[in-house]
Amino acid sequence: MPARPARALDLLLAWDGSAAPDRPEPLIFAAWREAVLAMAFAGAGVAEAARPAGTAEFLAFLLHPDDRGAWWCGGDCAALAGRALDRAVDGLAATQGADPAAWRWDALHVARFEHPLLRFIPILGPLTRLEAPTGGDGETVNRGGYRDGGPGG
């Protein structure tokens, strides 16, 4: 395994599951989860526009030890998970830099506050938008969105 994905994997394996804003692990996990789900849906022939939002339940189904999700993964979900980590880490390196330990969840996970109409007016839009970096994720009470398309994009 190349050094960068290996370092990211080490971080994930030592992670306590906290989605703290200053940590790289939730960012790596979110990008990996998106990559696993995208690759599984693509491999099963599900058109991108028809793909449901990824859920923790479907990810658990794919990665269950009894291989119940193998059809979605081309027969080997562990291999797909490894390829997804490579893809996720490459994508993050392009936007966050080369060192996975220096990445931060709050670089892409923000609470955004903006006026529903004024945001479309060129001069007023930026003046009526506030963003605050935040921790948490879609599976916690501290829910927030992604900046610029998410951790994988």
Question: Model features per residue range: what roles?
Answer:
Residues 1-153:
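Acidic, low-complexity N-terminal propeptides/linkers enriched in Ser/Thr/Asp/Gly that mediate export
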